[in-house]
A protein has these predicted regions:
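Sequence-level detector for tyrosine residue identity
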Residues: 16, 21-23, 36, 80, ...
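Charged, amphipathic alpha-helical linkers/stalks
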Residues: 23, 27-111
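Electropositive phosphate-/nucleotide-binding environments in soluble metabolic enzymes
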Residues: 14, 40-44, 141
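Short, acidic/small-residue loops that bind anionic groups at enzyme active sites
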Residues: 1-18, 32
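Generic marker of "main functional regions" within proteins
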Residues: 15-18, 30, 34, 47-50, ...
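C-terminal non-catalytic accessory extensions
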Residues: 112-180
């Protein structure tokens, strides 16, 4: 299914977008990187690529007699549609291994990031961290090393908390386990 995705931003966002790209490659592989493009500081090029992508989507749907207002051909397993409750138990039991199919690893990484956001900014998540300590995120080194690098970069770039105030205290701990 054609679906144009472009990660873009000003020149100042280039290092950030490159870090995301490297993380996707290190954890999900080159095949996952082929599902998006990165365009830096060029709104006209983004518009051009999105217009071309939209043409491809329309052509694809016309050829298959599919609607334009709803993607009837897209099938998403129910397990990927359920909300993730970021409890300490759920965070610790996430499977983060390169041995998983890429779509399952991607879903579990999304859950891990969702938990980190909850622990950083959501009232219930903050209270759970205060009561039980940081979440533990377990996984094999092939996933955990790139995840730890990315999260450390986010901390350095002040992406984990609002500017000002006290220094960021992580609401998580990255724990490497043996590869499955």
């Amino acid at each position: 299914l054609p679906f144009p995705v472009i990660l873009t931003g000003p020149r100042s966002a280039e290092a950030y977008l490159q870090q995301l790209h490297e993380f996707v490659g290190a954890t999900l592989g080159h095949a996952a990187q082929r599902h998006y493009r990165i365009v830096i500081d060029d709104p006209a090029e983004v518009a051009k690529q999105m217009a071309q992508g939209l043409k491809e989507v329309k052509q694809f749907r016309r050829e298959r007699n599919d609607a334009f207002h709803f993607n009837w051909m897209l099938k998403i397993d129910e397990s990927f549609q359920r909300p993730f409750e970021p409890t300490h138990e759920n965070m610790a039991s996430l499977q983060l291994s390169r041995s998983l199919p890429p779509h399952e690893l991607a879903a579990n990484l999304r859950r891990a990031f969702s938990g980190i956001v909850a622990g950083n900014v959501k009232d219930n998540g903050i209270r759970m961290i205060e009561q039980y300590g940081p979440y533990e995120i377990h996984g094999d080194p092939a996933v955990m090393l790139p995840l730890d690098r990315l999260l450390q970069a986010f901390v350095k770039q002040h992406r984990m908390k609002l500017p000002g105030g006290a220094a960021y205290v992580p609401c998580y701990r990255v724990v490497q386990t043996e590869a499955a």
